[in-house]
């Protein structure tokens, strides 16, 4: 039987029995033990017999061969030679490890300067520049450190061989983080020894400057996106306090937007920033006194709706206008909340919002109508209770963003097509998947331990000052290429457009969720399942395995650059009918707990704002998926500005243009994409609304938020009032003070210690106030609703 050997670096070579004979001879020589060559050859033959059962698909791993050498030598009575062989293996391993930690500085610099390495375009946000060169050099050293000094050989080899992808190896940091804008407003910027400290901002212009600096500082301590929540709600009181004109507000917002798009971050990049905008004042903030200059104002957030509209108008107008050349702003990526009380009428801000969406595809939309998310989730992570260690929480804050005081310490993506290609059947597929999930979970636990130690030692001074802990940050496991799983799996042989592959994908996602619950119990950390954006991983995996297994099926057409389809998405050339794609994706995307989004790729901008608003509304009201975008393609000419659609040359002057499309979650010029993603763009079929048909359309009536107009009961003399708190909740202390000041008698309940009461009343977060008369009870969740209860008593 002819078979091949998989080397440690993943390369495949022809089997050569002479190499086994040579290794055995060296073990005998090490003991000065003479033996006839025929004995050596006989032992080598026995080795081939020993590992025969480990050969799969004509392939055998070099480690399996070496294990068999040890076994055969021991069984043949050469225990001393077996020991010498083990020492020989360890010595070879040390030499390999030494080589892996030595970088060729000339190759390192030349590969970047000459753009000979595909990783120069690994991240489309990094411009070819001296800053990019510095990032490339330091990143290579840091990645080597992770793989050679931190992770064990099993984890490092799984990454090197392309079984998994350990994201952000170039950074000795966590992945992404959401920050409390309220905390910045209350405490100001600083508090780090030896660094300048600024008092809480008293004016909008000052706050905008502090936000730009804050995001830039934090970006240097994290690898990925930095996020603020409730941007419009928290900024509105500054407009009200100073009675600012619209012109003054717009100047402030312009300075913020231009500031966060300045390439001030490592690698000559702008800080990867995300903001969420509430559009209407959220219920959990409405009754709270607004904060300006670090102090409470004599008015509440609900009193600032007019000013909130001014902030939103200024933000959208600036984003629509673009820069001096008509180029759309890359950051911040805005996420808008679509709730049941979203006003779809013809208002100035609605026209602007959906014009921006149609022209640049800028915003993400959070679906709070049909998804299982709540608008307050984005601000309540640090107050959520963890009574059930198996409960998988949703990571809030949008596709790239994160809710307040939460985020992810790291991401590992599993190469699903490779598992399918090697698996004999479904049972073998799950065995292989479980092993890689175990390795991934362990790698994330190792990373959490390392960066937590570094946090405590002061390596991330501003993160330590404003966050202090990674306890509310997730360990993220993602996947890629379920479409190609269907094509490569012997029991499927069908892509994601076929029902049997869709059903298998649902079963796989459910299986992965169950194992993540196991890891939460085992490690005591939060785990989440992500539809990985995989900007470069899609290309790295496919490129690596096409070289190793030429017959593996990728998403590329014959002769095209190989790539894998993101997560469990449909083939990019599937259909012009957007609703046909949504019908399939809806049941898949809702199985993830983060990072899942549906991109409505359009050839060019929709004709008017009403058609855009109609599409956004139809998706929210008819589907359960949590996040989505409207993503038109557009071009920019340096002389003639914005051009709708894909035009690599300007229709006016014939000059070269920049063509912009969404690469994974953000807009970048197609010319900057890596080869795999560029091939995906070529293969993509854009949606045509004229050819799209929504079946069984439903419309959700415009209603007020649940509970907004309920009459709040008063605490009668016979009522029992209980305040459920936790030791770490920052709002619980404020709730005590308000209740004491109002002379309302209450019992303080430790929600984590008194689980029976917590479960009885369905407490999910702190603070929560329960008022009961024995027959029934009323629940007041969050500080805003508790304050409203107190005022009406």
Model-found features: residue ranges?
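Structural micro-motif
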Residues: 761-770
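Conserved catalytic cores of very large enzyme subunits
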Residues: 91-95, 101-471, 492, 498-652, ...
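Core structural elements
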Residues: 68-74, 278-279, 461-485
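Local sequence-structure signature of Cys/Sec-based thiol-disulfide redox active-site neighborhoods
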Residues: 711-742
